[in-house]
Curated annotation (Swiss-Prot):
Protein name: Chain length determinant protein
InterPro entries documented for this protein: Bact_polysacc_biosynth/exp, LPS_length_determ_N_term
This protein's record includes keyword Cell membrane: yes
Annotated GO CC locations: plasma membrane
Originating gene: wzzB
Length: 325
């Protein structure tokens, strides 16, 4: 009787197939190597944590200034420009816009230093211009908070100085324009007075030629330039003397211009306490540092140490098996 030899798939072993149990046994036997590798990795991680620079982020939220914060500035603009002065809402938008631009410029400058500092400004809510979130990354929590407050104040002072300079320039220009306007109106008033005197003198000549000494009309309202001589030479001579000593006649606009000039000259820069922003949230004192993260660093050290240790064990055993062949 012939017995057939059937191949059982479970009894054949592929030499290239990984034996999981054998792998685990190898790792168990080399556990001391793995443990030492993990300990070394943890030691290196602790050393890194000891020397690595800590990063703490302080954050503040700002928005446009209140009306009260720019009351002096708004009043100055009203004095300078009168009816053409910008609205309070426009001033608020302009000020926070200048603050944002100056803050961004400072952040760029700090980032380009030999030892860069991270200062950022961005909208707090996506697709909305205000409020703005500003932040600073420092090596200590207190340092980050202090630096952020310092840089915010620094930018505010810079904007304040720029606004005062702009105001001085605008006041100087406004004063010059008003003075020029007054001089122009005074020249016009003087010319009108001189013209009136010449007209009366001309009428006096006609009256003398016509030998009209007494008024020939009953109502002076009906007298025109052509019939002015009918008032008579005596009246015309008296009118010339009166017009010569009479002060210049100005329109109401002249006195309003003088009042505007006086108001501008009374403006004082020391009284203008301008702020280009308002705090929604003052710089925070961070309670958690951004990096390095102790827990994550140690966990990664354990995993990396274990992987390196396992690699050493398996590599060493593979080398032994290869040499044995």
């Amino acid at each position: 009787m012939r017995v057939e030899n059937n191949n059982v798939s479970g009894q054949n072993h592929d030499p290239e197939q990984i034996d999981l149990i054998d792998l685990l046994v190898q790792l168990w036997r080399g556990k001391m190597t793995i443990i030492i590798s993990v300990i070394v990795a943890i030691a290196l991680a602790i050393g890194y944590l000891a020397v690595a620079k800590e990063k703490w982020t302080s954050t503040a939220i700002i928005t446009q200034p209140d009306v009260g914060q720019i009351a002096g500035y708004n009043n100055a603009m009203n004095v300078i420009y009168g009816q053409a002065a910008p609205k309070v809402s426009d001033l608020q938008e302009t000020l926070i816009g200048r603050f944002s631009s100056a803050f961004s410029a400072l952040a760029e400058t700090l980032d380009n230093q030999e030892e860069p500092e991270k200062l950022t400004i961005e909208p707090s809510v996506k697709n909305q211009q205000l409020p703005l979130t500003v932040s600073y990354v420092g090596q200590t929590a207190e340092g980050a908070q202090m630096k952020l407050a310092q840089y915010i104040q620094q930018v505010d002072d810079k904007v304040n100085q720029e606004l005062e300079k702009d105001l001085k320039d605008n006041i100087a220009l406004g004063r010059k324009n008003l003075q020029d306007s007054l001089r122009t109106q005074e020249v016009v008033a003087q010319e009108q007075k001189d013209l009136r005197i010449r007209q009366i003198q001309e009428a006096l000549q006609y009256a003398n030629q016509a030998q009209v000494t007494k008024p020939q009309v009953q109502q002076t309202e009906d007298v025109t330039q052509d019939t002015l001589f009918l008032l008579g030479s005596e009246a015309l001579e008296s009118m010339i003397k009166h017009e010569a000593t009479r002060p210049l006649v100005f329109s109401p606009n002249y006195y309003q211009t003088r009042q505007n000039l006086l108001d501008i000259e009374k403006l004082k820069f020391d009284d203008l306490d301008i702020h280009a922003y308002r705090y929604v949230m003052k710089p925070t004192l961070p309670i958690r540092r951004d990096s390095p993260k102790k827990a994550i660093t140690l966990i990664l050290a354990v995993l990396l140490g274990g992987m390196v240790g396992a690699g050493i064990v398996l590599g060493r055993n593979a080398l032994r098996n290869y040499n044995a062949k």
